[in-house]
Amino acid sequence: MDPGGGGGGGGPGPGPDMEEPADLEVSVKTLDSQTRTFTVGAEMTVKEFKEHIAAAVSIPPDKQRLIYQGRVLQDDKKLQEYNVGGKVIHLVERAPPQTQGPSSGGASRAGSPSAPHAGAPPAGPRGPGAPVHDRNANSYVMVGTFNLPSDGSAVDVHINMEQAPIQSEPRVRLVMAQHMLRDIQALLARLEPQPGQQGQQGQQQGQALLAESGPPRPGPPGQTDGETSPREPTETREPTETREPEDGVAARGTGPAPGPAPAPAPEGNAAPNHPSPAEYAEVLQELQRVESRLQPFLQRYRAILGAAATTDYNNNTEGREEDQRVINLVGESLRLLGNTFVALSDLRCNLSATAPRHLHVVRPMSHYTAPMVLQQAAIPIQINVGTTVTMTGSGARPGPTDTTPTSGQTSSPTPSPTSGEPGPDGAPSGPAPPQAAGPPRLIRISHQSVEPVVMMHMNIPDSGSQTGGTSSASTASTGLPGQGLGQQVSGFPAAPTRVVIARPTPPQARPPHPGGPPPAPGATIPVPGSNASLAQMVSGLVGQLLMQPVLVAQGASGLGAPQAPATASASAGTTNTATTAGPAPGGPAQPPPPPPPGPPQAEVQFSQLLGSLLGPGVPGGPGTAGGATSVGSPTITVAMPGVPAFLQGMTDFLQATQTAPPPPPPPPPPPAPEQAPAAAPPGSPPAGPGGAGGGPEALPPEFFTSVVQGVLSSLLGSLGARAGSGESIAGFIQRLSGSSNIFEPGADGALGFFGALLSVICQNLSMVDVVMLLHGHSQPLQRLQPQLRGFFHQHYLGGREPTGPAIRRATHTLITGLEEYVRDSFASVQVQPGVDITRTNLDFLQEQFNGIAAHVLHCTDSSFGVRLLELCNQGLFECLALNLHCLGGQQSALTNVINGRIRRLSGGVNPSLVSWLTTMMGLRLQVVLEHMPVGPDQVLRYVRRLGEPPQPPPEEPMDVQGAERAPPEPERENASPAPGTTAEEAMSRGPPPAPEGPPPLEEQDGAAAAESEPWAAAVPPEWVPIIRQDLQTQRKVKPQPPLSDAYLSGMPAKRRKLRSDLQQRLRADPNYSPQHFPNAQRAFMDEP
């Protein structure tokens, strides 16, 4: 597929002088992603053009190689003959002598035929795998793209990743933007009038990566959405540029090599490659040019859409097809343009820094999705920087003749149903059931710098066998009952990535390299020891996965589920993980170990998945599917959505995943100080309905803890968290904020109670405990029982006996103290007419806190932690549903309330941390609110209306200065869901997943609310009490009733009569209840 001639075949050539203007505007793009536009005479020859641009590109004319549509421009021909006017030509520098091979890791990198990529049939020669000159090196793209052989041959690819330090996220952003702009230009080239051959070239250029015209055919865009989608074509082409595909490029100086090569690793760069503001300005200029070119088509796009509803195309098929083409291409251009704006919008330049200044990002890529995960089709692999990686491509048996496209990204292989059959290279991955679609090919990657070795397998079906996936998968699963298959999310547009991590058995701990004959099978039952190194391996992976939405797939015996597409990505920041798509890796002749638990119980927890790493050989344990004894290496299987949440949204994913029997684990907590407290006491995350399951028995708590610590070190490393330490939340926050006492425990009233409670929680729980709580483990709360019980007895009841009346009186006193904070929290949002939001929240909090306090004071058995977690989760979701109902279903209003409280609470915390927290909370909260397990009808009983008599206080309120109950529930709510990316999982479970308990956040809210109003710092101190009093006075003004006298007096008699008729009908209807039909009650029954 790589043969260059293919796609661009008709390109240059031939054409007799095509009619071009006297001057041509030609854009030249070098491999350092700089694009320069030159206006030259149409009669200028290629050689003259090289001399013309030599000074600008800093490459002597004799070393320049201009490539257009996959062909090298010949010096003696005129530019006009190539029809390059308004197009982009790629410029590379002639390859250096072969003696200058890379200095590390690449055995075959510099020598012989550049990187021997597993090539499809020696499809056309390729240029050198790694040009040494940094101009030809894309230091920002860590990707190997290669063809898989269909004839069973195996080739090793060694990639030198030493340029890791050179990677710069601002540079990545600019490169992404330039790639997307280039894709837009390619789309525009298809929209603009041009010779007929151009269209064909555009179709073929998907394989000829350098070609300008073919990037975004329907395939790539459809494959992925979001920010990575635009990169699909770009990544594909990025390496290609360097490898100068197409025939002509073979002349590049090194011997031909089959298939495309991975992005070359620059040798020359030694310092961080941060872009300068001028480069940003150039990209913006290019963006402006693209927008201006797009403008006329955008106008036509609007015109087509404006008339689309009624236009008759019955007798105008050609017109319909043309209009449809415009809609599709302009729509795709808008998507790319939007992603370009997203990529560029976070770039900033600090003018106060010393010159020379460079760009930095204010919001890391992980804010949107996993950084640099290439998610387009065949085998985009992001390899960990700083490690030497050996990749072996092996075909199973000679199957269908077609091979994966050269670009490795232009095709979208369907998930392969089973693990590969023994490949000719002698590295069988396990028995494969009969397949109708032909044996899958297998990619194996081993990180040689990690102990234990992590094997990475990818099943890749032949391009020709891209059947529905579901049918082949079902046959696979039925054929192999003992092999658990990742549970496919039904209805999800593209199957999520399936990651299988295997810990090889001891005899295979260090295979010479995956391509050669593997060591003798040896013992197939893994040694349970070395949990530390295994935990380190898994924690790195999980740390990355927690940065993005994740669905943990459970293998269900007998369930036919398509495997996920073969896309694998390893976080660039994680040094000891390998992720894969496909069956469980393992030694030769080992049956693929079943993925996590197969039983469709709703009590599956994250720990059980990790437990499968340790207990695959235990009959009926979590490591076996259907109770079959497994002798394979332990594995953990995780399915990841392939679409970044920041653009695509997780709606489809969540809706689809709700059909999966086992609920995925709850979200992990964001490493923010404010968040941590929220997740603290009752504030624990969603827990699976059942706590037990096979996981806990197979997984020692120490192992889970070590994994979590590794995850935290990956998540919080940038915040200076000490990995593996039992640092308490309080210590972590204090170290982060520089404050010695952030909770103000000495205050009076409710503020004092909650400040003290929060201090107790944060001093006794670590971030590891919080993560465990968020994953449904109640052990930390169970461990905290004595402290909580003593604290409530002392500070809540004042030493009195914990009788029912005493608890109710204490709760009343406590929650009443929060009235001012609740009112203040909702002061800036629009509440439903007639609803008393303050009393609604106070009564709700009082009832919830009554239950929590009674449980803390009365429960003495082992169910303490589990029940407390359930109470907190239930309270959180009911609070969210209640306030969402009171705000008229306006999610933005609820988000504003929560973020406002967070900002007030975080007065002394690093602003960037607060910004990150509010943004993350908002994203997670939106997901949670869209899939609330609690409906409005379940919380209507808590709604209080203006004018209703208040509830009588319990007999004589306690004089003990109780504390207050949490202010607006919303905050804590936001806290729990916001944590971590697995929030979607929590939601998709449907059971009662809800992070953290109400009390913690609320208290904080109240505390901070009083002290740090946003406006308080902007006015003289003596004005603050006066302004506060005015605010309170204004809030007491009664809202106008729903139907005013003015409205009624102006109402036509007929309508007035209709209203009275409806009132009579409602009064006579035995099924009518104001509680069930509040809108009808308000509209027709309430007297104005």
Curated annotation (Swiss-Prot):
Domain Ubiquitin-like: residue ranges: 24-99
Post-translational modification: Ricin can induce the cleavage by the caspase CASP3.
Modified residues (N-acetylmethionine): M1
Biased composition (Low complexity): 101-121, 193-207, 398-429, 463-479, 560-583, 1007-1025
Keyword list, A-Z: Acetylation, Apoptosis, Chaperone, Chromatin regulator, Cytoplasm, Differentiation, Immunity, Nucleus, Phosphoprotein, Repeat, Secreted, Spermatogenesis, Transport
A molecular-function term among this protein's GO annotations: misfolded protein binding
Primary location: cytoplasm
Chain positions of site Cleavage: D1005, G1006
Keyword Transport: yes
Region (Sufficient for the delivery of client proteins to the endoplasmic reticulum), start-end ranges: 1027-1088
Domain notes: The ubiquitin-like domain mediates interaction with the E3 ubiquitin-protein ligase RNF126 which is responsible for the BAG6-dependent ubiquitination of client proteins. SGTA also binds this domain and competes with RNF126 to antagonize client protein ubiquitination and degradation. The ubiquitin-like domain also mediates the interaction with USP13.
Primary role: ATP-independent molecular chaperone preventing the aggregation of misfolded and hydrophobic patches-containing proteins. Functions as part of a cytosolic protein quality control complex, the BAG6/BAT3 complex, which maintains these client proteins in a soluble state and participates in their proper delivery to the endoplasmic reticulum or alternatively can promote their sorting to the proteasome where they undergo degradation. The BAG6/BAT3 complex is involved in the post-translational delivery of tail-anchored/type II transmembrane proteins to the endoplasmic reticulum membrane. Involved in DNA damage-induced apoptosis: following DNA damage, accumulates in the nucleus and forms a complex with p300/EP300, enhancing p300/EP300-mediated p53/TP53 acetylation leading to increase p53/TP53 transcriptional activity. When nuclear, may also act as a component of some chromatin regulator complex that regulates histone 3 'Lys-4' dimethylation (H3K4me2).
Protein name: Large proline-rich protein BAG6
Organism expressing this protein natively: Ornithorhynchus anatinus (Duckbill platypus)
Lineage start: Eukaryota, Metazoa, Chordata, Craniata, Vertebrata
